[in-house]
Curated annotation (Swiss-Prot):
Extent of Basic residues compositional bias: 1-11
NCBIfam families reported in the protein's UniProt record: PRK12288.1 (NF008931), ribosome small subunit-dependent GTPase A (TIGR00157)
Enzyme class: hydrolase
The protein's assembly and partners: Monomer. Associates with 30S ribosomal subunit, binds 16S rRNA.
Binding site for Zn(2+): 296, 301, 303, 309
GO molecular function: GTP binding; GTPase activity; metal ion binding; rRNA binding
Record's function text: One of several proteins that assist in the late maturation steps of the functional core of the 30S ribosomal subunit. Helps release RbfA from mature subunits. May play a role in the assembly of ribosomal proteins into the subunit. Circularly permuted GTPase that catalyzes slow GTP hydrolysis, GTPase activity is stimulated by the 30S ribosomal subunit.
Main location: cytoplasm
Gene this protein is translated from: rsgA
Protein name: Small ribosomal subunit biogenesis GTPase RsgA
Cofactor-binding details, from the entry: Binds 1 zinc ion per subunit.
Length: 349
């Protein structure tokens, strides 16, 4: 007999009980100031409830408590922490402060608004593939997210080894749409290793996120780039009915590439939606539209069949790609459909 799927309310209660257990466990470890070393810098490798794994400057990991005055702490945060003179109940230090973030990746939550899930990201690697079909709509969705978050994108088209010469020429022509907008595009194959060296160079010295739909080869790419033992963690599935799973599969985690650079990965990081955005944010997310904003005849122009629309006029002059224009309206339509089914409220600032 299959397990009964938990409702949203039941999942939230399971999560709340889990957090209370972690908080209770945390209260068992009380650090006296005399037991702590001098403050030092660190990076959050992963966060587990009231605890976090901190990487010290020497590369060693320390499971730490988190000061109750710290209200937001995610993977990638740069912190000040203090090591304990001894390990107590598996805890070897405490996080005392968080440095200001250069960037933060957020995910819309149906109940809690925008939730930060990773910090200090330099680029989002948008992984797409030519099979079962090349979806420009998905690429454009992620580009809108990148523009809204103000994080630089890198488009990686995987599985190009499956293309013949004619197919390759067609895909190159399609990708020229994005190159013309000054987006970086990389064609590669994790199977033949074509383009892997170029991708390694693009990742070196940066903190990256890999994003894309299931089946496009994200895990295969990461397996090709990371140490095998680390990469194996990335392909595990979450089987826990509560959706919490194990720490190694559900918590966002930072990995180091052997060639240099880092990646933050988790199932929640790889896929994130746009339904929480306002239409105006989506419009600005199409960077080629920006020069025409404010030039339409009507202030409430929907940039479709409205008379005097500057964006449609640019489309008709060939200054905007029809594929991008069509995807813009598809995104708005899908967002409107989702918002009729979900309720969303942004958190107070």
């Amino acid at each position: 007999m299959s397990k009964k799927k938990l409702s949203k309310g039941q999942q939230r209660r399971v999560s709340a009980n889990h957090q209370r257990r972690l908080k209770h466990a945390d209260s068992k470890v009380e650090w006296d100031d005399s037991q702590l070393s001098e403050p030092q810098e660190g990076v959050i490798i992963s966060r587990f409830g009231m605890h976090a794994d901190v990487e010290a400057p020497d590369g060693k990991l320390h499971r730490c408590n988190i000061r109750r005055t710290i209200h937001s702490l995610v993977t990638g945060d740069r912190v000040v922490w203090r090591a304990g003179n001894e390990t107590l109940a598996g805890i070897s230090g405490i996080v005392e402060a968080v440095h200001p973030r250069q960037s933060v990746l957020t995910r819309p939550d149906y109940y809690d608004g925008l939730k930060p899930i990773a910090a200090n990201i330099d680029q989002i690697v948008i992984v797409s593939a030519i099979l079962p079909e090349l979806s420009l709509n998905i690429i454009d969705r992620y580009l809108v997210a990148c523009e809204t978050l103000e994080i630089e994108p890198l488009i990686v088209l995987n599985k190009i080894d499956l293309l013949d010469d004619e197919g390759r020429a067609f895909v190159e022509e399609v990708m020229d749409i994005y190159r013309a907008l000054h987006y970086r595009v990389l064609m590669m194959s994790s199977h033949t290793q074509q383009g892997v060296a170029e991708l390694e160079a693009a990742l070196t010295g940066r903190v990256s996120i890999f994003a894309g739909q299931s089946g496009v080869g994200k895990s295969s790419l990461l397996n090709a780039l990371l140490y095998p033992d680390d990469a194996q963690i990335l392909v595990n599935d979450v089987s826990d009915a509560s959706g919490l799973g194990q720490h190694t599969t559900t918590a966002a985690r930072l990995y180091h590439f052997p060639h240099g650079g880092d990646v933050i990965d988790s199932p929640g990081v790889r896929e994130f939606g746009l339904w929480h955005l306002e239409p105006e944010q989506v419009t600005r997310g199409f960077i080629e539209f920006r020069d025409y904003l404010g030039s339409c005849k009507f202030r409430d122009c929907k940039h479709d069949t409205d008379p005097g629309c500057a964006i449609r006029a640019a489309l008709e002059r060939g200054e905007i790609a029809p594929e991008r224009f069509d995807n813009y309206h598809r995104i708005l339509e899908s967002m409107a459909q989702v918002k009729t089914r979900k309720s969303f409220s942004a958190p107070d600032n």
